[in-house]
Amino acid sequence: MLVMSHVLAAVAWPYANGPRHIGHVSGFGVPSDVFARYMRMAGHDVLMVSGTDEHGTPIQVQADAEGVTPRELADRYNRVIVADLHGLGLTYDLFTRTTTGNHYAVVQELFEGMYRNGYIVSKTTMGAISPSTGRTLPDRYIEGTCPICGYESARGDQCDSCGNQLDPIDLRNPKSKINGETPKFVETEHFFLDLPALAGVLGQWLDTREGWRPNVLRFSKNLLDDLQPRAITRDLEWGVPIPLDGWRERGDKRIYVWFDAVIGYLSASIEWARRSGDPQAWRRWWSADGPGKDAPSHYFMGKDNIVFHSVIWPALLAGYSGEGSHDGQPGELGRLNLPTEVVSSEFLTMEGRKFSSSRRVVIYVRDFLERYDADALRYFIAVAGPESNDTDFTWAEFLRRNNDELVAGWGNLVNRSISMAAKNFGAIPPVDPAGLTEADETLLAVARAGFDTVGELIGRHRQKQAIGEAMKVVAEANRYLSEQAPWKLKGEADRPRMGTVLHVALQVVSDANTLLTPFLPHSAQKIHQLLGGTGVHAPMPVIEEVEDLDGGPAYPVLTGDYTVGARWESVPLAVGRALDPPKPVFRKLDPSIVDEELARLAG
């Protein structure tokens, strides 16, 4: 593996208009945590950041409907989402929000820097209003036929079928999603990102991307064929104010949510540094001319957000850094790194249907965690999630994976290995002085080889293959125990051999536990302790209530100390370390849960 001192894990920002369901976390949450945990275990200095995305039309419209302010709505769901992600054990160095003073300042700095460099321009365009109310009609609440692919339910800002960004006036047969009326289009002044002026630098950058998933790279390059200037402000009262003379005080114009949300990766890194006591520490992951010039950055999101991470965000970074056809000078933050890798997952469906809160085709993370263990969901996402193809979550398949693989495979190996050693020796047994057999050596070698194989696959974002390789070690160890049958070695003369077999089995349990720690951290900590280990093996995040650094109201963040924990290596077990009879690590689920959960879906 390449030696990397600093690694940025930038995770898509969940929108703060409701609790998260398992489809959300399958695409960005769990995969990013697996990657970050592995990288830390391998010795890298990881900064994993994200937060709740709290601006934009949907929140304002929902708040109006509920009779609350947008801030009150965002506050509510920020806390819910923080609790959801904490329950899954996602190890954010900082999970914050976009309504902080720090975020506003960073967004406005990038806006001003790009404006000075000529990559943000003002122009008059056509905006939609409701004929019946006279109010601005948000583009997200206009629906019609996509002019590019013909999809009949395209939104006014983006087509979910072909992924292209749109303007409401581009749609054929546009209708308001609020009341079904045809919008009226009137002139309005807005600021635009001059994407064509950045097409050259984007193309050169994309040509240097190696190891990207083919669909992501192909889609991104296709977007460059017809880049158009994109509006980055909206007729809206809720959002980041425009930081230019004559615009700051206006209450009817705000920076578009997609512009401010992607800047969150940078603002969260800066906030983390400020909170850590070293305000310039963020530069170790971001500064293209300084300490972060060789720092790789990995961005995690669902496929519907590829355009924002492979075109829009790189364009903002390049424009602010003074690159592109207009040239210019970097702003006060300096030249900033463009993404190293954009890791896009496909979609997770549920029982053959698209997730939908309104149609009750959903299971929220908080509800799942009330009934099942976090590692059961993390395991399903790792082995059967939407890494490279759309995947269907069914309760029958979840039950099978949990009972047949997690419980009967991994859980069985842990339980019987430790049980036999505790019963017959009360501790980690010694190896027979006569030495190891070929079977012993072979199994130990298989486990040791897993550190290279599994680690390399996680590093390349091939997590399905990675956990598959780790579970092969588990299967080999179960086969070894069945063939060696230590329970049959009952005589005094056989006791040294029994001890050797159980020592080898326990060593492989320890190694396999380390290999599975990025995927199954909750159970990994338990298994570490069952093996007589002490201290933190798999660190967990904590929720902290913090004050806004720039004078705003307090809010909860996810953070943690992840400098402790297991290393990515085989650690020899200490002979004589006491062992107690183990309790089952994983819960076997009753088949009746399938019908129970399907009944819940049916309402």
UniProtKB/Swiss-Prot annotation:
InterPro entries: Anticodon_Met, Met-tRNA_ligase_1, Met-tRNA_synth, Methionyl/Leucyl_tRNA_Synth, MetRS_core, MetRS_Zn, Rossmann-like_a/b/a_fold, tRNAsynth_Ia_anticodon-bd
Cofactor(s) it depends on: Zn(2+)
Disulfide bonds: none
Entry keywords, A to Z: Aminoacyl-tRNA synthetase, ATP-binding, Cytoplasm, Ligase, Metal-binding, Nucleotide-binding, Protein biosynthesis, Zinc
Motif 'KMSKS' region, residue range(s) on this chain: 354-358
Positions annotated to bind ATP: S357
Entry-linked Pfam families: Anticodon_3 (PF19303), tRNA-synt_1g (PF09334)
Nucleotide-binding keyword on record: yes
Subcellular location per the Swiss-Prot or TrEMBL entry: Cytoplasm
Motif 'HIGH' region: where in chain: 14-24
GO biological process: one example: methionyl-tRNA aminoacylation
CDD domains: Anticodon_Ia_Met (cd07957), MetRS_core (cd00814)
Cofactor binding description: Binds 1 zinc ion per subunit.
The reaction(s) this protein catalyses: tRNA(Met) + L-methionine + ATP = L-methionyl-tRNA(Met) + AMP + diphosphate
Cellular compartments per GO CC: cytosol
A GO molecular-function descriptor: ATP binding
Catalytic activity, EC: 6.1.1.10
Residues that hold Zn(2+) according to the record: C146, C149, C159, C162
Main location: cytoplasm
Function noted in UniProt: Is required not only for elongation of protein synthesis but also for the initiation of all mRNA translation through initiator tRNA(fMet) aminoacylation.
Oligomeric and partner information: Monomer.
Similarity remark: Belongs to the class-I aminoacyl-tRNA synthetase family. MetG type 1 subfamily.
Protein name per the record: Methionine--tRNA ligase
Organism of this sequence: Salinispora tropica (strain ATCC BAA-916 / DSM 44818 / JCM 13857 / NBRC 105044 / CNB-440)
Record lineage: Bacteria, Bacillati, Actinomycetota, Actinomycetes, Micromonosporales
